[in-house]
Every structure is written in C-alpha cells, then in structure tokens.
C-alpha cells in the first residue's frame, strides 16, 4: 500500500550550522549585564562594505564598543556575516551567529573570527568575575 500523502516531509541532517562559543557560569544571574548584539552600518547595495560596527545591550556593550581591536576585527568578519549575539542562559553565556550554509564553514571560522570570539569571551568572563 503506497502512501501518497501530500504532507510527506523528509527529515535528516540539513546543510546548515550555527557557530556557538560558550562561557560557563551562572548566565541567568548576569542577564541584564550580558545580553547584547552587534549592529552595523553598510555602504552599497550590490558590493556591500561595512562602514561601522557597534554593540547594543547591557553593560557588556559599553566594554565591547571601547575595544578598538575587536571593532577592527568585526568590521572585517561581519561583511559576510549577520550579527553576533551574546545570550545568557541557565548555566552559561552563549556567543553565537545566525545559521550559515555548510559550504561557507571555513570562511566563517577564520583566524580573525576566532580571535574576535575569544576577545568577546574574555570580556564576558571579566564582567562575570567583577559582578559576582
């Protein structure tokens, strides 16, 4: 007996990924301080270039905005990326981007991108230690 249902869905691995960096700690305790995301000003329609990058959110946004090395890295890595988010959860703080196509993995995990995520994680850790 054949199943000719129009509602058949295929499941399985999809060719998308999401980059997550995790800082362990009581993230919920610092929710107001650590919730943040990047914003950017882009120039051009077809050949886009990032002119400026800044952070919006809690106390951490002030620190991240004052880090000139991080800003330089973000301008170069966010030209192809969406925003970066900092999200405190129950027992950690997640630093992540939106879902990406699997074929772009090496471009989104460049040396500069990993350095930027490490700088962000360092700022997260320092705020968590400061306000414990």
Stretches with model-predicted labels:
Residues 10-16, 22-132:
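Charged, low-complexity intrinsically disordered regions
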Residues 1-7:
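Short N-terminal edge-element motif at the start of the domain
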């Amino acid at each position: 007996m054949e199943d000719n249902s129009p509602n058949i869905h295929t499941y399985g691995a999809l060719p998308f990924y999401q980059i997550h960096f995790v800082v362990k700690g009581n993230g919920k305790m610092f929710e107001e301080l650590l919730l943040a995301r990047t914003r950017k000003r882009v120039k051009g329609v077809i050949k886009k270039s990032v002119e400026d990058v800044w952070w919006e959110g809690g106390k951490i946004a002030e620190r991240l905005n004052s880090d000139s090395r991080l800003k330089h890295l973000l301008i170069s890595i966010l030209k192809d990326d969406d925003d970066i988010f900092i999200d405190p959860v129950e027992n950690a703080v997640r630093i992540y981007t939106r879902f990406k196509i699997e074929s772009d993995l090496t471009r989104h995990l460049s040396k500069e991108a990993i350095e930027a995520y490490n700088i962000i994680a360092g700022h997260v850790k320092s705020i968590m230690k400061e306000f414990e």
